[in-house]
Amino acid sequence: MCGIVGAVAQRDVAEILVEGLRRLEYRGYDSAGVAILDTECNLQRVRRLGKVKELADAVDSNPIVGGTGIAHTRWATHGEPSEANAHPHVSGDISIVHNGIIENHEYLRALLQERGYVFESQTDTEVIAHLVEWELRSAKSLLEAVQKTAAQLEGAYGTVAMNRRDPERLVVARSGSPLVIGLGIGENFLASDQLALLNVTRRFMFLEEGDVAEITRRDVNIFDVHGNAVEREITESNAEHDAGDKGQYRHFMQKEIFEQPTALINTMEGRISNDTVIVESIGAGAADILRNVEHVQIVACGTSYNAGMTARYWFEALAGVSCDVEIASEFRYRKFVTRPNSLLITLSQSGETADTLAALRLAKEKGYMSAMTICNVAGSSLVRESDLAFMTRAGTEIGVASTKAFTTQLATMLMFVTALGKQKGVINPQKEKEIVTSLHQLPTQIEKALAFDKSIEQLAEDFADKHHTLFLGRGEFYPIAMEGSLKLKEISYIHAEAYAAGELKHGPLALIDADMPVVVVAPTNELLEKLKSNIEEVRARGGLLYVFADEKAGFEPCDGMKIITMPHVSEYTAPIFYTVPMQLLSYHVALIKGTDVDQPRNLAKAVTVE
């Protein structure tokens, strides 16, 4: 959600700033802007509604020469998408960009209006610009003005300030919204995501909660929430430099779907041997923590929540440990009871999901024995603040609709559940070997699922003119139906719902008619015959059935029911396997409908505000 890029350099920074924004397009936005101090210390600001390309074209047509600048992509929260509401915002000599939500902006706006400030936008961000300008009147430096401003702000923010009268300096403040500083030679940078800066540096410092930093070409000085000078660890990133390249694929989502076999190999490398899960790969002290776990609480949002819902079945059936799963935005506001020896697990692709991060911090206060995150971004807030971090290693995921991050989350969870069950003496060596063997086979099985791409593309034509779709599953395949439903609604804008198939009689059957496609996930398991009865209930009411069925399940196509016969796979990895056709179906339906597959309307990749 929103993207920030900043630079202080001897060279011209316009191209660096715009390229940084381009690399952050996947996060979702509706407008973009840049502000640069030129060689005469005049502020040159360009803002555009729409894509970064429109901003880039505007900057190219009137090149800006200058070494200090800030840039931003905005995802509207306060105020409609418009050029007037686009960042950077200006107050006197001060320019500001900001991610997050200032919760007391109405009070501050009224206060500033009493002081004579005139607001040109509907945003909460403009409040910060005017506050910094006001504080600078009495402060000794921009740093002091930003520190005094930050003390007045309530809510989440990652903000950058630039002063026309102090042209080789940026000051940044972070509270609840991530910011990273990129270190160069005689130049320094900042961004909301290190991906924005991988073309200019590999050395990064991640700001912590409450940090304020002063950045010049030669120095970075960081101060904590109390104003004390602090040092932050410098890390070297090995993230993919060309992650923003689609290669031979039409969309990033398509690319990421087809990257899943390789991503899963990376996820499992060094974590499983021929027949065991390597407990030490989870992290130092993991073995002792796992032995004491009596309950697991999973907290997540969106696709990650669906992964958690799937893993719940594994925790209880395989490891014998009770497990609850809750949406982070609900968990953090509920008066819950912390069970003894309860392990909190957070799931997040970005590691910066605002509600999930807040839930982690709350859980620490409430006495959870330990906290682990399953995450895709090293150095993210969830990774830094958790006791254990089990990385998914999916590689950079650009498409807003998550694909490889989901399947690698599931594989990571299955490895963790196996390790937990082993440490607690519930999973014996024979069962562990069966699970590990199925994991070794998984990348090849995913390749087989991807081979259905063309047949699913033809199937997608049936959905293009539909307005609603129902997804059904039972047991651990109910969350897979949930994920299929989420993918379809995210990128095709078709209203889709998922139900446990046994719930049909309790409401959903009222929706069934000849215009309602019903997608069913039908592996071979102990619930197959029950599921077949549910399918017959839909057929009897004229529903259009599309059944993704195990080859051993005994389905035959008939009027009103199309069967997509899938290879038989292990019961342990079947939920991961059946995710892939759901992804392909959603992708091809969206393609036919002509929607923006990689950046669907109103959505953002990393939800860093509540």
From Swiss-Prot:
GO terms for molecular function: carbohydrate derivative binding; glutamine-fructose-6-phosphate transaminase (isomerizing) activity. It is an enzyme of class 2 (transferase). It is found in: Cytoplasm. Keywords: Aminotransferase, Cytoplasm, Glutamine amidotransferase, Repeat, Transferase. Residues 2-218 form the Glutamine amidotransferase type-2 domain. InterPro entries: GATase_2_dom (IPR017932), GFAT (IPR005855), GFAT_N (IPR047084), GlmS/AgaS_SIS (IPR035466), GlmS/FrlB_SIS (IPR035490), Ntn_hydrolases_N (IPR029055), SIS_dom (IPR001347), SIS_dom_sf (IPR046348). It holds the Pfam family GATase_6. Its EC number is 2.6.1.16. One of its GO terms (biological process) is UDP-N-acetylglucosamine metabolic process. Residues 286-426, 459-600 form the SIS domain. Catalyzes the first step in hexosamine metabolism, converting fructose-6P into glucosamine-6P using glutamine as a nitrogen source. It comes from Photobacterium profundum (strain SS9). The active site is at C2, K605. Homodimer. SUPFAM superfamilies: N-terminal nucleophile aminohydrolases (Ntn hydrolases), SIS domain. GO terms for cellular component: cytosol. NCBIfam families: glmS, PRK00331.1. It catalyses: D-fructose 6-phosphate + L-glutamine = D-glucosamine 6-phosphate + L-glutamate. Its main location: cytoplasm. This is Glutamine--fructose-6-phosphate aminotransferase [isomerizing]. The lineage of its organism: Bacteria, Pseudomonadati, Pseudomonadota, Gammaproteobacteria, Vibrionales.
